[in-house]
Amino acid sequence: MLHSASVIFLSLSVLAAVGVWGPFVRDGGFDAMDAVVARHPSTGIPGLQHYPEFDRGLMSIVAFNLSAVNSIAYCFMMQFLANVAVIPVILCTEDSSAAPGSWVRYSTIWGLLSQLGTSAVIYPLYAMSFIRQSSREPSQTRQPMSDMALILNMAMGYALPAAITLNVLHSSLNMQIWGILAFTVYPICMKLMARIIKVFTGFRKFPTRSRHQSIPTLRYAVAGGVALQGHLWYLGTELGIFKGHTPSLSAEKMDSEGGARLVLRFLQVDYAITFLAMLLLAWHELIYHRILPAWRALGGLIIGWILVGPGATLAAAWYLRSRFIMAPGKRKKRYGD
């Protein structure tokens, strides 16, 4: 029998998906996105619907089944972590046109810092989880995550985004955008960051890559990170996001206002729905392992989303889950025992 909180949360998730994705599909949002991506001058990407294997990879990761993740799932996570960078570009552009002291200015600054910080915090924790959960050691013998690892990760994760968001160098909009785009190569350092964290947490063993894995993670991240820069810049100019800052933009390309709105809506919805699904499963894990009561876990996830962003909240929930499961001798110290 389902818990009442489960019914409420699941119902809200379904309503959000139907209420927002429905109009998007009805208005031809996917067709508009495919039309833009398919016109890429260098790669000629055929469209988003031609890659169904990424959906299967997403399901593996969202289900926290990292020990059984295949190469497609690793590739999808790299792509997902890199592509969240397009929202900060949009926020930065909108912030530059907002009136000083307005609520729009404050909301975009908060959103930009939250988004960049979310990305910076979640990347190395995903790397750590890849290493830990793909280990062949029994879960009871693995060393739990260190509190210092999370503190250091938060400090490193929010320092550079704060400098970019607050524009401490007083640079132009184009320089800020290039700073954000440069920040998106952070996934390339994902495995290197995991090795740095290893020093602070005392990890001694790293799993060896299986011979049947066809796509090395780091090689894919490097290629994907380089390609992402060109794709983001092309999509930005194609959709008129950088209107007024790209003199070479032709009159024909400027006639894409409807497409820009649809793509922006897609990015917003995709970001919210993806993290909502992942936080829903994180909430389930917290109450399934009886780490927190249902309503306390739900309230903490909601407050965390508002204050520090969904990615950092998900990372914290994942940290609690992993620390409880991996910590030896802590199995009986659950609430209610």
Curated annotation (Swiss-Prot):
Keywords: Glycoprotein, Isomerase, Membrane, Transmembrane, Transmembrane helix. It is a multi-pass membrane protein. It is an enzyme of class 5 (isomerase). GO terms for cellular component: membrane. It is found in: Membrane. Pathway: Antifungal biosynthesis. One of its GO terms (molecular function) is isomerase activity. The chain crosses the membrane at residues 5-25, 72-92, 111-131, 149-169, 177-197, 222-242, 267-287, 298-318. Its EC number is 5.4.99.-. Disulfide bonds: none annotated. Glycans are attached at residue 65. Belongs to the membrane-bound ascI terpene cyclase family. Cyclase; part of the gene cluster that mediates the biosynthesis of the tetrahydropyranyl antifungal agent lanomycin that acts as an inhibitor of CYP51 and blocks the ergosterol biosynthesis. This is Terpene cyclase.
